[in-house]
Regions:
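Catalytic core of membrane glycerolipid acyltransferases/transacylases, capturing the structured
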Residues: 1-33, 39-40
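Non-catalytic C-terminal accessory region of glycerolipid acyltransferases
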Residues: 35-176
Length: 176
C-alpha cells in the first residue's frame, strides 16, 4: 500500500513538488483551518489507506522528538485504526536547512524504525503524550545502535543532538 502523507498546503503550489504531491494523492493541510484535511485523512484511513502524519508539524532542528500535535491520534481514533509511529535518525546528515546537501551515494547511515501499533483511547492529549514517549525511547535506541555500529557520535557536529554533545540546538532552543 502507498502512504498518503499530510503536508502543508504551500508545498502543493511549488512548481516541481506540487504536481508530484498531487499525482501521488497526498493531502494538503491548511495550517489555519485543517478540518478539511482531517476529514479527508479519516476517510482515507477508514478505506484502508495508510495516512502519513509528521506529528511534530515540522522538521526538528534539535534532531530530538519535539512537542507533537494530536492530529495523528485523533485521525486514528476516528477511523478506528492504530497509529504506527516511525522514528528516523541520520537523514539530517543528508539534508539539513542551512547546511550543504549531501545527496547521492554517500553511504551515510540512516536508521528507521517502526514501533508497535498504538490504538488511541480517544483522549487525544494522553494518546499523543504516550506516542511521543514511545518515540523518544525508540530514538534513544537508534542512538545506541548508531554508536554500537560506528562508535561515539562526533562532538560538536551540526547533525548530532546537543544531548549527545553535538552542535545541534537543544530541544528548548529549537522550539524557541
Amino acid at each position: 500500500r502507498l502512504v498518503r502523507f499530510l503536508a502543508k498546503a504551500g508545498i502543493f503550489k511549488a512548481p516541481l513538488a506540487g504536481p508530484l504531491l498531487k499525482a501521488m494523492h497526498h493531502v494538503p493541510v491548511d495550517r489555519i483551518d485543517g478540518s478539511a484535511s482531517m476529514r479527508q485523512a479519516v476517510r482515507l484511513a477508514k478505506k484502508g489507506e495508510l495516512v502519513g502524519v509528521f506529528s511534530e508539524g515540522t522538521i526538528s532542528r534539535s534532531f530530538e522528538i519535539r512537542s507533537m500535535k494530536s492530529g495523528a491520534s485523533r485521525i486514528a481514533y476516528e477511523a478506528g485504526v492504530p497509529v504506527i509511529p516511525q522514528v528516523i535518525f541520520g537523514s539530517q546528515r543528508l539534508w539539513t536547512k542551512g547546511h550543504k546537501k549531501n545527496l547521492g551515494r554517500t553511504k551515510t547511515p540512516v536508521f528507521i524504525t517502526a514501533l508497535e501499533p498504538y490504538y488511541p483511547t480517544g483522549d487525544a492529549e494522553a494518546d499523543t503524550a504516550e506516542i511521543r514517549r514511545r518515540m523518544q525511547e525508540a530514538l534513544e535506541g537508534l542512538w545506541e545502535q548508531y554508536e554500537a555500529e560506528f562508535g561515539p557520535m562526533p562532538a560538536g557536529e551540526y547533525w548530532v543532538p546537543a544531548r549527545k554533545v553535538g552542535g545541534a540546538p537543544t530541544l528548548d532552543e529549537a522550539e524557541a
